[in-house]
């Protein structure tokens, strides 16, 4: 059927900020969909709140709205733009929920807007647990025994009938939010209560646990002609019981017989047809390993995380084709963009194995509960491709960027059998490593299978790796063993350690013996047809399929998996850099390993290598391609960390030199550079012993900011206010010695300013200056940023501009630089300089219209700023106000403290823009998920040092009609200031207390700056966690609180009695 001509304008709904459960995969799918619809001649309008994406670039759609994804704002856009249709299936759970809300509100009917791709009835049938169960019964498809419940009593009824364990699945939620497995009554009460709270329709499905079954996924496509195909089927190495986003996944499935494969394939196709989905759909199934009994777990009637993985695993662009199907085209009319010869109705075939390993944030949150269950915890993932599972798995392990090069962790070697058993049964982020350790220690595959029901096939693969380790260690210098180890994916790093050599020696040894990998093409058809895609992976085989052209080329290193501190912003910069390289006439080559991102879409670069970002894997590509050089400044810390090793291999680093990168990163060299330039910085020193640290802190005065010199991105940073806190930090957070010194700086309680600039070594251009609402001490990624600055004097602005220009020139920066300043007592100090792209590049690029990554790349390639139409100086400020607000995923990470500090905790960001700061702040806060009611109650529990400041805040809340609640100490301070307050019991009281108020939803805000320690038992910690679990905005920074007050005050009319007004005026006259 040809495309529809009765519609002209389509509104695409994005997925909003990155949170756990919904990451960069929707930037990839949304970008593809918008381009796909524009190709077909439709006018595309996009609404999304996330400025860090390629999707929200003005070139992606005909009109781009960066606005909150709420009913209020999306309805306004629909009424203004009057689209013919909306496409919500590419915006993740957010997009689907928005479509349901828009339909129920009547705005779609009022404006005559049609839903494309998946009908509203299909969304509700797949997402509403009751309707889905009924549909499965109608199709005679088995589901686990289950019951829909709306309260705890109904849950008890089901458990009494079926017994424990049971799985709780809340309706219409993302990444299993609020769900879990209950083994007893205590867990049932906790998880069901949480699930009902998180479900927008207060509904959960309780089902008998089928944990232990194999978990299999089918990614399917269907068009309006009822053509339906399987794009990819995938198998979770972890059995049912661990969320698929937290499971290690392989494609294609490895342990299914043909009969099982066909049985589950037919079921998947039957379900997509019954739902009437036109586009992509993900079906999750459970298979009993000992019979042909299977169960349908759930269906995602949209493009999902798994579809991004399936697209990159097969090369078949699901989102692009789903968009074309949504406008009426059929699979037999659409040409497969990979082969450019076959049609999209051909099912992809794979002649390689793909592995996906999740990237968890536990390196950031050491106190987090690492146990994996039905609620997702990973922030991102890596993917790798190999000719066998062992190779694929080991390549994925070293892609994780945790400093791990093999399936072994030193700290696990000490574990005894009983501890290993417990951890393998329970499942956490290290389970596969523990399985390998257990096999090393002689535990049998039968025992491990009994503990965790992982399939024998996968256990055998792990055993093959362990056996090969023994071979390697027993045959030092043996080339045949080395060849076999390399074919199994062993790294030079591992072999070097086993053979007591350096990694470089192993690399040279292989080159001398012609032992180098070849590159194979990902072509969707197992080489059955010729392919036109430049998409490659390495393996140790015979024929190389990556043909080197005679064009000059440049390699860009990507930023690897999405994690806290290194998000989609770096992928944005990478993609823009690649486009600039192509514009400059070079061949652009990208190396990355994240299946969720736009950068790993094969249509972006001239060549895509899907490989780990280690020196070994990167050098294989450089040895083949022989590029002009490598750009490292767009891939975050991942790429910067490779610069020194690349230079050792004789590779040219393009842009800022390694020496100058080091000058910005090395403490002593940086201090010397600042002194030479006459730029002030906070007083600080380096300690290599605990005694030294104590002496330095005494000398420069508390509070001090302490951090290790060898970790970046705010990890293990803390502000300490007295000696006992410093000693606690030195003992628990770092291991200090001569090689690992600790940096101790005077902590200045001032205003933080962030600047991004582009330098060509001679000229320094500053697109924008941002002011942080939270004072210095809160990580810049967790602060609310405002552009243009609202409270900086012209004099201070000039100082900042002068310092930025001096640093750009003085540090010989070629490309981007990011500087953080603190304004303290009307003086500007430099806190740090990052000689690379920062997370604010997409935000400032969109606001100012300066394509920063593009301009910086052209500078790196030799075109100076003046040639590009920019010179030295500050870009004229925009008239509107723009706010960048952080978004957190605390609800997914139990036992993580929500207090803001120098260590970054946010997973994503949103933008609010308007004519005034108050309106922009309102949009930013609402988009980030903070509800802003104009009245209600606020709980205030603050540390003694904050009491004075909190009084002014409390007074302002009272003025706008809020009811104030506080525990005895704070309440007394408020009463002394004649501020009305209701006293509530502390949390250790047996009677109705502060936590009960939070649980019952009787407070709209909690202001809490108590006990900023990391002990979960502390009062402050428990109050903050309870707020998160119950969806109450918990404010741990008084600056953030003031920002919210500004918004509330702007929304509230003043209500003063006439007497108060006359008294005030009389007072002014008296003191005039």
UniProtKB/Swiss-Prot annotation:
Region listing for Allosteric domain, in residue ranges: 930-1072
GO cellular component, as recorded: cytoplasm
Database matches in InterPro entries: ATP-grasp (IPR011761), ATP_grasp_subdomain_1 (IPR013815), CarbamoylP_synth_lsu (IPR006275), CarbamoylP_synth_lsu_oligo (IPR005480), CarbamoylP_synth_lsu_oligo_sf (IPR036897), CbamoylP_synth_lsu-like_ATP-bd (IPR005479), CbamoylP_synth_lsu_CPSase_dom (IPR005483), MGS-like_dom (IPR011607)
Pfam families cross-referenced by the UniProt entry: CPSase_L_D2, CPSase_L_D3, MGS
Name the record gives this protein: Carbamoyl phosphate synthase large chain
Domain annotation MGS-like: ranges: 930-1072
The EC number(s) this enzyme carries: 6.3.4.16, 6.3.5.5
Source organism (scientific name): Bacillus cereus (strain ZK / E33L)
Binding-site residues, Mg(2+) 2: 298, 300
Pathway, per record: Amino-acid biosynthesis; L-arginine biosynthesis; carbamoyl phosphate from bicarbonate: step 1/1; Pyrimidine metabolism; UMP biosynthesis via de novo pathway; (S)-dihydroorotate from bicarbonate: step 1/3
Region Carboxyphosphate synthetic domain, annotated ranges: 1-401
Record remark on domains: The large subunit is composed of 2 ATP-grasp domains that are involved in binding the 2 ATP molecules needed for carbamoyl phosphate synthesis. The N-terminal ATP-grasp domain (referred to as the carboxyphosphate synthetic component) catalyzes the ATP-dependent phosphorylation of hydrogencarbonate to carboxyphosphate and the subsequent nucleophilic attack by ammonia to form a carbamate intermediate.
Residues that coordinate or bind Mn(2+) 2: 298, 300
Annotated binding of Mg(2+) 3, by residue: 820, 832
Any GO molecular function: carbamoyl-phosphate synthase (glutamine-hydrolyzing) activity
Gene: carB
């Amino acid at each position: 059927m040809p495309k529809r001509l009765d519609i002209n304008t389509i509104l695409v709904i994005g997925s909003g900020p990155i949170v756990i459960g919904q990451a960069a995969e929707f930037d990839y799918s949304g970008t593809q969909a918008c381009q796909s619809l524009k190709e077909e001649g439709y006018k595309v309008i996009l609404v999304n709140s996330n400025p860090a994406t390629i999707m929200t670039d003005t070139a992606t759609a005909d009109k781009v709205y960066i606005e909150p994804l709420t009913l209020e704002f999306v309805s306004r856009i629909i009424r203004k733009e009057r689209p013919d249709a909306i496409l919500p299936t590419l915006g993740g759970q957010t997009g689907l929920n928005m479509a349901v809300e828009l339909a129920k509100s009547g705005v779609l009917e009022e404006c005559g807007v049609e839903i494309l791709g998946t009908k509203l009835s299909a969304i509700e049938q797949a997402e509403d647990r009751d309707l889905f169960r009924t549909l499965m019964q109608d199709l005679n498809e088995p589901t686990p025994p289950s019951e829909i419940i709306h309260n705890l009593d109904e849950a008890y009824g089901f458990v009494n009938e079926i017994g424990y364990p049971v799985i709780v699945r809340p309706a219409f939620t993302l990444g299993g939010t609020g769900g879990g497995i209950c083994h007893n009554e205590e867990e049932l009460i906790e998880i069901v209560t949480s699930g009902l709270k998180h479900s927008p329709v207060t509904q959960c499905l309780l089902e008998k646990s089928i944990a232990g079954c194999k978990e299999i996924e089918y990614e399917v496509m269907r068009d309006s002609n009822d053509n339906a195909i399987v794009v990819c089927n995938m198998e979770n190495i972890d059995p049912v019981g661990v969320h698929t986003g937290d499971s290690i996944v392989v494609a294609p499935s490895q342990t299914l017989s043909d009969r099982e494969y066909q049985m589950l394939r037919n079921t998947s196709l039957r379900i997509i047809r019954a739902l009437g989905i036109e586009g992509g759909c993900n079906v999750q199934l459970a298979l009993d390993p000992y019979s042909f009994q299977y169960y349908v777990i759930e269906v995602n009637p949209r493009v999902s995380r798994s579809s991004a993985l399936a697209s990159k695993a097969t090369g078949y662009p699901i989102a692009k084709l789903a968009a074309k199907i949504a406008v009426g085209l059929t699979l037999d009319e659409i040409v497969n963009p990979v082969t450019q010869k076959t049609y999209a109705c051909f099912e992809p075939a794979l002649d390689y194995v793909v592995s996906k390993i999740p990237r968890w944030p536990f390196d950031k949150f050491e106190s987090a509960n690492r146990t994996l269950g039905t609620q997702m915890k990973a922030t991102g993932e890596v993917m790798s491709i190999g000719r066998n599972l062992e190779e694929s798995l080991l390549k994925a392990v070293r892609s994780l960027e945790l400093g791990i090069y093999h399936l072994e962790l030193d700290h696990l070697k000490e574990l005894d059998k009983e501890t290993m058993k417990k951890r393998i049964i329970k499942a956490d982020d290290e389970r596969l490593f523990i399985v390998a350790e257990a096999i090393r220690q002689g535990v049998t595959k039968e025992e491990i299978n009994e503990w965790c029901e992982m399939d024998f096939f996968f256990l055998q693969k792990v055993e093959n790796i362990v056996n090969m380790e023994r071979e390697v260690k027993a045959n030092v210098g043996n080339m045949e063993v080395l060849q076999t180890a390399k074919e199994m994916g062993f790294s030079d790093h591992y072999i070097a350690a086993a053979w007591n050599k350096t990694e470089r020696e192993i690399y040279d040894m292989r080159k001398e013996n012609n032992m180098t990998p070849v590159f194979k093409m990902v072509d969707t058809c197992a080489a059955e047809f010729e392919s036109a895609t430049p998409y490659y992976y390495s393996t140790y085989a015979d024929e190389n399929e990556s043909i080197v052209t005679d064009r000059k080329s440049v390699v860009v290193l990507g930023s690897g998996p999405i994690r806290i501190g290194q998000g989609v912003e770096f992928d944005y910069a990478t993609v823009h850099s690649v486009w600039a390289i192509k514009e400059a006439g070079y061949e652009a080559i990208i190396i990355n390993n994240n299946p969720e991102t736009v950068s790993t879409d094969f249509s972006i670069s001239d060549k895509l290598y899907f490989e780990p970002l280690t020196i070994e894997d990167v050098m294989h590509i450089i040895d083949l391609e022989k590029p002009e050089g490598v750009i490292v400044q767009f891939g975050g810390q991942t790429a910067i960390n490779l610069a020194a090793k690349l230079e050792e291999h004789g590779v040219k680093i393009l842009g800022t030199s390694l020496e100058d990168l080091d000058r910005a990163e090395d403490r002593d060299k940086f201090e010397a550079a600042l002194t030479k330039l006459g730029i002030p910085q906070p007083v600080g020193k380096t300690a290599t012993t605990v005694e030294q640290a104590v002496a330095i802190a005494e000398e420069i005065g508390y509070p001090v900011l302490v951090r290790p010199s060898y970790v970046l991105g705010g990890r293990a940073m803390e502000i300490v206010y007295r000696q006992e806190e410093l000693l606690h930090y030195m003992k628990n957070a770092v291991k200090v010695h001569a090689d690992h010194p600790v940096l101790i700086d005077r902590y200045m309680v001032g205003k933080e300013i962030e600047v991004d600039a582009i330098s060509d070594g001679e000229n320094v251009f500053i697109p924008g200056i941002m002011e942080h609402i939270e004072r210095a001490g809160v990580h810049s990624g967790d602060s609310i940023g405002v552009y243009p600055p609202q409270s900086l004097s012209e004099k201070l602005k000039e100082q900042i501009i002068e310092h930025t220009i001096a640093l750009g020139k003085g540090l010989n920066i070629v490309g981007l630089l990011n500087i953080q300043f603190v304004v303290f007592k009307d003086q500007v100090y430099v806190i740090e300089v990052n000689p690379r792209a920062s997370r604010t590049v997409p935000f400032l690029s969109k606001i100012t219209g300066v394509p920063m990554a593009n301009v910086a790349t052209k500078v790196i390639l030799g075109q100076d700023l003046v040639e590009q139409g920019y010179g030295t100086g500050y870009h004229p400020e925009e008239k509107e106000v723009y706010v960048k607000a952080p978004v957190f995923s605390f609800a997914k990470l139990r036992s993580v403290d929500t207090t803001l500090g120098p260590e970054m905790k946010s997973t994503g960001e949103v933008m609010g823009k308007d004519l005034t700061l108050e309106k922009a702040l309102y949009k930013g806060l609402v988009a980030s998920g903070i509800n802003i009611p104009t009245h209600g109650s606020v709980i205030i529990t603050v540390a003694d040092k904050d009491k004075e400041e909190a009084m002014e805040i409390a007074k302002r809340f009272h003025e706008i009609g809020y009811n104030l609640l506080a525990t005895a100490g704070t309440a007394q301070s408020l009463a002394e200031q004649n501020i009305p307050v209701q006293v509530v019991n502390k949390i250790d009281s047996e009677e109705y207390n502060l936590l009960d108020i939070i649980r019952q939803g009787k407070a709209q805000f909690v202001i809490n700056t108590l006990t900023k320690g990391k002990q979960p038992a502390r009062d402050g910690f428990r109050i903050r966690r309870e707020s998160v679990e119950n969806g109450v905005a918990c404010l741990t920074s008084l600056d953030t609180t003031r920002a919210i007050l500004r918004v509330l005050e702007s929304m509230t009319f003043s209500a003063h009695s006439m007497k108060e007004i006359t008294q005030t005026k009389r007072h002014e006259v008296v003191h005039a």
